[in-house]
Amino acid sequence: MKALSKLKAEKGIWLVDAPKPVMGHNDLLIKIKKTAICGTDMHIYNWDEWSQKTIPVPMVVGHEYVGEVVDIGQEVRGFNIGDRVSGEGHITCGHCRNCRAGRTHLCRNTSGVGVNREGSFAEYLVIPAFNAFKIPDDISDDLASIFDPFGNAVHTALSFDLVGEDVLITGAGPIGIMAAAVCRHVGARHVVITDVNEYRLELARKMGATRAVNVSKESLKDVMKELGMTEGFDVGLEMSGVPSAFHAMLDTMNHGGKIAMLGIPGGEMAIDWSKVIFKGLVIKGIYGREMFETWYKMASLIQSGLDISPIITHHFKIDDFQQGFDAMGSGQSGKVILSWD
């Protein structure tokens, strides 16, 4: 089968002929229709420090996808051949304390599809049936292929009550932009998103952000005055991993504010903890998606009218994968989709 593999311990990714994956008794075999390129895939493509420590070579990568079930393990119940599915990319152990308590997204033994095991940049993928999610008929393949990052946005955004609240999002990558759309859809008052990338900020405006702020040109505090905000933001969603962005968030949070952190700093990050203490801030770390409550919420949000389609800006056939990675690497894109049909 065709697959995109990290063949060498250097920058790049290669289109190869790989063996079809072998299915177990509790697995599904999925014929891939569309995949999306994630920021994690770009780290692997660029072979950065994290990738060098994490990714075995060779490895078929990718974890954002939609496909069709073409074979079912003999112990699997609840799925049929022909079902359209996406899937949770975190394969959990099922026996640690968190898994047994139903908190599977906090499994300490998580294995990542396309990171620790063969991924979805291929004509076929095998995953445990437990990890598969049936896609409702009224949700398109394009949207289903980005459910993984959309889930990051939904998990982060819905960590705290948003109705009538003022929300600051630092980092206008695709996940931050989708989070802005979620916040507006569920009833936040002002949703302000910050970045220095004008292309991404314009996408955020299209997706419903009240104000998309280029912090290299505008002061966040001036924007707050413009919006009539006198006390600070009630909810912060940190999506960038950039220390200066998080510091700006701490400066502008209201007393009693709540912060959800998805962005991963490049290293240790010093902060002024006195601001956290004296403001009585709550900080929550976010990893992945809640299984499977986040997935049901994703589908319900789209079915209730949330439109995240503007975040998809580029489509390529799999043979043109290099153009897709170039588009993602340019910073002048939203989500990039590769078609395997």
Swiss-Prot record:
The active site is at residues 40, 43. Zn(2+) 2 binds at residues 93, 96, 99, 107. NAD(+) binds at residues 175, 195, 200, 262-264, 286-287. One of its GO terms (cellular component) is cytoplasm. It is an enzyme of class 1 (oxidoreductase). GO terms for molecular function: L-threonine 3-dehydrogenase activity; zinc ion binding. Keywords: Cytoplasm, Metal-binding, NAD, Oxidoreductase, Zinc. It holds the Pfam family ADH_zinc_N. The keyword Cytoplasm applies. Gene3D superfamilies: Medium-chain alcohol dehydrogenases, catalytic domain (3.90.180.10), NAD(P)-binding Rossmann-like Domain (3.40.50.720). Binds 2 Zn(2+) ions per subunit. Catalyzes the NAD(+)-dependent oxidation of L-threonine to 2-amino-3-ketobutyrate. Homotetramer. This is L-threonine 3-dehydrogenase. It comes from Shewanella sp. (strain W3-18-1). The lineage of its organism: Bacteria, Pseudomonadati, Pseudomonadota, Gammaproteobacteria, Alteromonadales.
